[in-house]
Swiss-Prot record:
Entry GO terms, CC: cytosolic small ribosomal subunit
The keyword Ribonucleoprotein appears for this protein: yes
PANTHER family: 30S RIBOSOMAL PROTEIN S2 PROKARYOTIC AND ORGANELLAR, SMALL RIBOSOMAL SUBUNIT PROTEIN US2M
Domain of life: Bacteria
GO BP term (any one): translation
Keyword terms: Ribonucleoprotein, Ribosomal protein
Recorded GO MF terms: structural constituent of ribosome
UniProt-recorded name of the protein: Small ribosomal subunit protein uS2
Family: Belongs to the universal ribosomal protein uS2 family.
CDD domains reported for this sequence: RPS2
A matching Pfam family: Ribosomal_S2
Lineage, broadest ranks: Bacteria, Pseudomonadati, Pseudomonadota, Betaproteobacteria, Burkholderiales
Length: 250
């Protein structure tokens, strides 16, 4: 579903941070200020959001993966829910250093998590109460840290981040590996190095929901379009195999 200017206004996307905390590199996206609060220019934010969503859709259409990241309190639940709805990996609790740059090691942890789940389903009766407690603690920690990426077998094709200041390590890792970045950037942070900037409030829960929902919708749409294209191609190929023969009466 396309995001509208009205929705952005109602979600408070235009409210930036206090003017004394601003980052001058965000000046092109600032409309002005009111009561010492910077006001973000939604006439610039909206098309940039649409461009970011279009990119996410294109990645999904070519069967790529968009990793959704939002570990700050007001983003956690929303990011997890929207990522699950879109069927993509996510990080909603904390970013582990090396999650991308040391993905080989992370995959070992993912295997451990999956093995433990299988073991749990089979039953833990063979373990002592102390061992069961230690098992439960390790499983809970792995689930919390990497549960959202347990089905991510390769590095993502793009990363969507809410609040660049809060996720500096994730952004640095993505840049190092050349993974395209889609990110919400508020007035107190620099947009440098972000491939698809969404200038906007990164603290409002309503705004966070709008961003995450918009990107998730784009991912779902892209995947749907890809399926439609495959179906059309199959139908066209099948049609070519049959040649109509007009019989003339003898």
């Amino acid at each position: 579903m396309a995001i509208t200017m009205r929705e952005m206004l109602e979600a408070g996307v235009h409210f930036g941070h206090q003017t004394r905390f601003w980052n001058p590199k965000m000046a092109p996206f600032i409309f002005g200020h009111r009561n010492k609060i910077h006001i973000i220019n939604l006439e610039k934010s909206l098309p940039m959001f649409q461009e970011a969503a279009k990119f996410a859709s294109q990645v999904s259409a070519r069967r790529g993966t968009v990793l959704m990241v939002g570990t700050k309190r007001q983003a956690r639940e929303t990011v997890a829910l929207e990522a699950q709805r879109a069927g993509v990996p996510y990080v909603d609790q904390r970013w582990l250093g090396g999650m991308l740059t040391n993905f080989k090691t992370v995959k070992t942890s993912i295997k451990r998590l999956k093995d433990m789940k299988i073991q749990q389903e089979a039953g833990l009766d063979s373990l002592s109460k102390k061992e069961q407690l230690m098992f439960a603690r390790e499983l809970a920690k792995l689930e919390r840290d990497i549960g959202g990426i347990q089905d991510m077998t390769v590095l993502p094709d793009a990363i969507f981040v809410i609040d660049v200041g809060f996720h500096k390590i994730a952004i640095a890792e993505a840049k190092k590996l050349g993974i395209p970045l889609i990110a919400v950037v508020d007035t107190n942070h620099s947009p440098e190095g972000i491939d698809y900037i969404i200038p906007g409030n990164d603290d409002s829960s309503k705004a966070v929901i709008l961003y995450a929902r918009g990107i998730a919708d784009a991912i779902i749409e892209g995947r749907s379009n890809a399926v439609d294209d495959v179906v059309k191609a199959v139908v066209a190929e099948s049609s070519d195999e049959f040649v109509e023969v007009n019989e003339t009466a003898a």
